[in-house]
Amino acid sequence: NNPNTRLVCEIKPSEISKARGVSVAEETVKLIRSLKAAAMVDYISFDFEILKKIKEIEPEAQVQFLNGNKSPKAIKKAGMEGIDYNHMVFKILPKWVKQAKKEGVILNTWTVNDPEMMDWFLKNEFDFITTDEPELLLQKQKSLWTEGNS
């Protein structure tokens, strides 16, 4: 067992209502607490209200916003830990990378399969990169690490 392994729990926005999404978030947190897994779970959602509710009922929870329409400064102000945005958001708004680092906001991106884009995110020291090509990304990460330590 790797104590550093984390579980990512995505709570989808409700198509029925915002209230339903918030209710699902509450029930999800209760379930994770009952499983004594709270310390190893990160929550992600495209619904900002869902994440705000999670932080309200579980202040220690690690949450990351997926939608891509809030700045790192706004995420920090809301008491959230990170942003997990589609890779194109960061290509369009590269200033958000610096802002996230300044604010201490976790940088996470998805889904990066293009080798040149992998290089860009690695060079910008993202905390997490979601990819369908993990072998290639690991190879690039090792090469970059080797270059930096020569």
List each language-model region with its residue ranges.
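Short loop-to-alpha-helix "cap/lid" segments that border enzyme active sites
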Residues: 2-150
